[in-house]
Amino acid sequence: MFERRIFMANPIVTIKMKDGGTIKAELYPEIAPNTVKNFIDLINRGFYDGLIFHRVIPGFMIQGGCPEGTGMGGPGYGIKGEFTSNGFKNELKHSKGVLSMARAMHPDSAGSQFFLMVANAPHLDGQYASFGKVIEGIEVADKIVATKTDRQDRPYEDQVIEKMTVDTQGETYGEPEIIEE
């Protein structure tokens, strides 16, 4: 008698940029389940549509997901930081193409802001909730990070996310567990 295992396919996010570029990323619910639920929930609510990558640093990452476009905004709540130094096993390394949640100093302060690695950054491993990886369109992120920026790393020309969608491959992801602000 042999055991039959059914593996569910991971969700795939499509980030369509206003300039026509597209980035696709696979999310890893087995690594950071609540982070993935939160990201999917925000995408399905249209939260990211029209927002910008407000912080881009060559050789490091691009950051988006702030409704104010300043790096100070969020969805009005936080989620528990699913990373090792916060008592949660997460071994996904911050290598090129990895998606991770931005946060303030408090480990449970992530909300909607995320960053996409354009280079390896091992010093972030275990400190931030990595939860997915680009599977297509990394060259779009490379183009975004190469844009001219001001002293606060904000692009002079807005890098606009026209629409973000997610294909959950038929799986249902419930509401995320949130921490009210």
Positions of predicted regions on the chain:
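Cyclophilin-like peptidyl-prolyl cis-trans isomerases
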Residues: 2-181
